[in-house]
From Swiss-Prot:
PANTHER family in alphabetical order: UPF0149 PROTEIN YGFB
GO CC terms: cytosol
Any Pfam family matching the protein: UPF0149
HAMAP family for this protein: UPF0149 (MF_00346)
The protein's name in its UniProt record: UPF0149 protein XCC3260
Family (UniProt): Belongs to the UPF0149 family.
Amino acid sequence: MDLPDVAAVQHESRQLDLASSAAELHGGLCGWLSGGGADSADWLARILADTAQVAPAQGGALDQMRQATVAQLEDRDFAFELLLTEDGAPLPARTDALFDWCRAFLGGFGLAAQQRPALSEEGEEALQDLARLAQASSDDFDTAEEDDTALAEIEEFVRVAVLLLHGDCVMGPRFRQRLN
């Protein structure tokens, strides 16, 4: 299942008077789901920690984003993708979106996983690396082609880190439960 485009998510976000970008919303959702948070229609209120937040419209871009994200995280072919910026966005906008995504991921993950989730050693390292990325900014990059390549590598690292954390907190416990 494909993610909706960034413009559609941004449009619905503005309709709900949200100050969050598409990258932040997707990052928070991914963190929530990867930390073991429930796949439910009220996910937005949960990641924003705002019980008064209205649930996204069923079938709207935010709901499609939730459904696609759940499907991608559960996909055995590792088809998970990050929703960051529109194609062709300048490097500083793409780097800021990635780092915003990481900050939101950590927030959603913390809300869902609580104090000390049971993580593998690799999961602990991945979470620490995501925290370091969340502290970065586009000022750490130039506009050179090599920085474009570096950003693509960081995006791939983040994608794999999310799948690892989802595996530790969701897939692993689910598998162990089936064995019992």
